[in-house]
Design a protein with these regions (language model features):
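Short amphipathic alpha-helical boundary/capping segments
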Residues: 1-3, 101
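N-terminal helix-turn-helix DNA-binding core of bacterial DNA-binding proteins
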Residues: 4-10, 14-36
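Short linear capping/connector segments at secondary-structure termini
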Residues: 27-30, 59-62, 89-95
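Short amphipathic alpha-helical interaction segments
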Residues: 35-50
Length: 115
C-alpha cells in the first residue's frame, strides 16, 4: 500500500529514533542498519533534511539526527510523496486544506484495495 520511498523514510526515522545533535549517525550506518539501497536512501535522507524532520552536520564527526521525536507517518508522506519542502505549522489553514485533500485521496485509494 505504501511506496518504497515512504517505507524507507519510515525505516530511516525509526533508525534515528535515539539520535540527537550529540549522538549522530552517518548516512552509511543508517542505510546499512535499515537495509536500504544507497542510491535511493541518500535521496530520501536529503528530502527528510530539506523537510525539516532530520538535521545533518558535515565533517569528521558529522552525520544525521532526528530534529523531533514528534513525527508521524503523515509528515513523512507529505515530505516524501508531495514534493513539498517544509512541513508547515498545523495551524496554517492552507496546510490543513492540503492535508485534507491528501487524506481524501488516500481514503479513495484505500477503497480500491481488496482484503
Amino acid at each position: 500500500m505504501f511506496s518504497k520511498k515512504l517505507e524507507y523514510g519510515y525505516l530511516i526515522m525509526k533508525t534515528l529514533k535515539n539520535t540527537n545533535k550529540y549522538n549522530m549517525m552517518s548516512g552509511r550506518d543508517i542505510l546499512t542498519k535499515a537495509k536500504i539501497p544507497t542510491n535511493m536512501g541518500l535521496g530520501i535522507l536529503s528530502q527528510l533534511a530539506n523537510g525539516g524532520v532530520i538535521c545533518s552536520a558535515k565533517g569528521k564527526n558529522g552525520g544525521f539526527y532526528r530534529k523531533s521525536q514528534d513525527i508521524n507517518l503523515f509528515h513523512l508522506f507529505y515530505i516524501l510523496e508531495t514534493n513539498k519542502i517544509n512541513v508547515k505549522d498545523y495551524l496554517d489553514i492552507e496546510y490543513q486544506k492540503e492535508m485534507l485533500n491528501i487524506g481524501l485521496l488516500v481514503l479513495e485509494k484505500m477503497k480500491t484495495i481488496k482484503v
